[in-house]
Amino acid sequence: SINEKEYPNIYKLYSEGISYRNNYSPRNNCNTGNNEMTAMTSLFTINNTCTADKYKNNVYPEAIFNMFKNAGYTTSSYHDYADFYYSRKIIHPNMGSSNYYNASRLNIKWSSLYAEWPSDVDLIKTATPHFINEDKFMVFMTSVTTHQPYTVSSEYGDKHLSEFSEYNYSTAVKRYMSKMKELDAAIGLLLETLETSSKLDDTVIAVFGDHYPYGLTNKDINTVLDYDVNVDKEVDRTPMIIYNSATPKEEITKYTTMIDLLPTLLNMFDVDYDPRLYLGHDTFSEY
């Protein structure tokens, strides 16, 4: 759960920012690729195919990168793993990302075994120098440390394991929580870097989860949450946050998903857009 003791930086964003309390991640056979694409385009994907790969060669003039690029922002995107499964190095530029950096371009060590995932702290360390000195930047980062598996030993699954000894959770849950500590540290480093560069008050940070931790059983997840994930597909409820240090906190309880993120951000930044071309809603509007 999101608490100040274990995850002070995530808690800060969630408790001091705009938090979406009934946000859900669509479930399909390509959760990460499709839901990332949905966030970037505000379009629904095809649930039985990896839409982001099948249509990677299309151009997307209304995608988030192009919209902010047209508004005068420098655009770039980053991921701390390889492109074995998702073709970000193709589709991101076609959406308007001027530069896409994967783990190899960032000189982050990674494994091809899909077991040892890199540290998101390294993602922040290596990515921020590429954009932090720009006057106006729009950046998309895809983190990876918290990914499954949780049932086997791993570097970051075990790194903070002892810190959760007081909790009566399964080892798999504790490994997930250990990995979350690394993500929390990465967010803390990002906040620190922005503040040191005098950019924090003028930066909006949006965070969403592409899917629930399906490497855990529903039974395991129920030991942590205060609601039953087996009821009404509550297991698919995931956090979504928009944070700016100078913006008052707000809890939004209407039902949302990442498809609503782009229209909301375009409204926040007063970017001219045609809402007929987006399937999501501006969450600050009445609907």
Question: Where are the regions a protein language model picked out?
Answer:
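Solvent-exposed soluble domains appended to multi-pass membrane proteins
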Residues: S1-Y287
